[in-house]
């Protein structure tokens, strides 16, 4: 299986989801001066911001991470979190990233996710990487 990369704000909702998921993952730092470089294909897990609009939906740290061509070349899919209070824009960072990076939007969950979300994502991530391996 390949990597998961995620960003979590100081609310730690996405971080708690990733801990419960229990799969190897790398966190994009909160401090914008700290940078990471990913050397293997990965699925990005990202929260949505902005109160419901597309503008500002993707966290700055994630934009900076994806603006690094090395990192952008290795993204294979995106999973987004958000708040259902945002209506149609719920989890919209996933839509924005999928469209801009040309990768599938695999799943979305609310806030910290439910146990059902954890089970679905764990199974889905494993199946996604199996399919990627077969088609490579």
UniProtKB/Swiss-Prot annotation:
<comment type="function">
    <text>Probably involved in ribonucleotide reductase function.</text>
</comment>
<dbReference type="GO" id="GO:0010181">
    <property type="term" value="F:FMN binding"/>
</dbReference>
<dbReference type="GO" id="GO:0036211">
    <property type="term" value="P:protein modification process"/>
</dbReference>
<dbReference type="InterPro" id="IPR004465">
    <property type="entry name" value="RNR_NrdI"/>
</dbReference>
<protein>
    <recommendedName>
        <fullName>Protein NrdI</fullName>
    </recommendedName>
</protein>
<dbReference type="InterPro" id="IPR020852">
    <property type="entry name" value="RNR_Ib_NrdI_bac"/>
</dbReference>
<dbReference type="Pfam" id="PF07972">
    <property type="entry name" value="Flavodoxin_NdrI"/>
</dbReference>
<dbReference type="InterPro" id="IPR029039">
    <property type="entry name" value="Flavoprotein-like_sf"/>
</dbReference>
<comment type="similarity">
    <text>Belongs to the NrdI family.</text>
</comment>
């Amino acid at each position: 299986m390949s990597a998961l990369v995620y960003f979590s704000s100081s609310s730690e909702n996405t971080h708690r989801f990733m801990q419960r998921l229990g799969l190897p993952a790398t966190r994009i730092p909160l401090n914008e001066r700290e940078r990471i470089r990913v050397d293997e294909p990965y699925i990005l897990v990202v929260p949505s911001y902005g109160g419901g609009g597309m503008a500002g939906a993707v966290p700055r740290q994630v934009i900076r991470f994806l603006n690094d061509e090395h990192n952008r070349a290795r993204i294979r899919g995106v999973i987004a979190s958000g708040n259902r209070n945002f209506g149609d824009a719920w989890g919209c960072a996933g839509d924005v990233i999928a469209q801009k990076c040309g990768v599938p939007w695999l799943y979305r969950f609310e806030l910290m996710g439910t146990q059902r979300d954890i089970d679905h994502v764990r199974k889905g991530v494993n199946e996604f990487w199996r399919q990627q391996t077969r088609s490579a």
